[in-house]
Amino acid sequence: MKRIKAIYPGSFDPPTNGHLDLIERGSKIFDELVVAILRNPEKDPLFSLADRRKMLEAMTAGFDNVSVDTFDGLTVDYALRVEAHAIVRGIRAISDYEYELQMALMNRKLQPDVETVFMLPAEQYSYLSSRLVREIAQLGGSINGLVPELVEQKLREKMDVAHKFANSEPPEGTTPSEGRKKSRKKKA
């Protein structure tokens, strides 16, 4: 009997309980599920690729048929490289559907043997996105229940560092914004 392997691609910056919900349900549908973290040089992520991978590996440690990997390039090409038969995509709203439908049709054109499987999140996660979680955390709001505890802890650590940096005194002889720009360049 043919084993069905799927990938669940995304930036996962940060991983949320909505992602975990789809991973859990996807692991019941597919024989093997690869959570594939996209390395996108066009984006400036909050968490490094290594941090996101560690968080997702911790979140999925209880699933025997789930692994975590990173990739760059076209998702369908990655699917072929790892011999996956399907791409799992979460759909929260009509706006997600319109975008994901276009991507699925293009992926089918590029690689007809790779199917896209749309999954709806559990109702309590239908509004949840990594972007919203980041915004709430940056503004000091509660993200309890939106992300696993490990992710909440990592987000709080990031926000504490960012808050301390934002409130630090600039180097002598510079304006506050110039001082921050120079500090950022030194870290890069």
Task: Kindly label every feature range from the protein language model.
Residues 1-188:
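Nucleotidyltransferase catalytic core that binds NTPs
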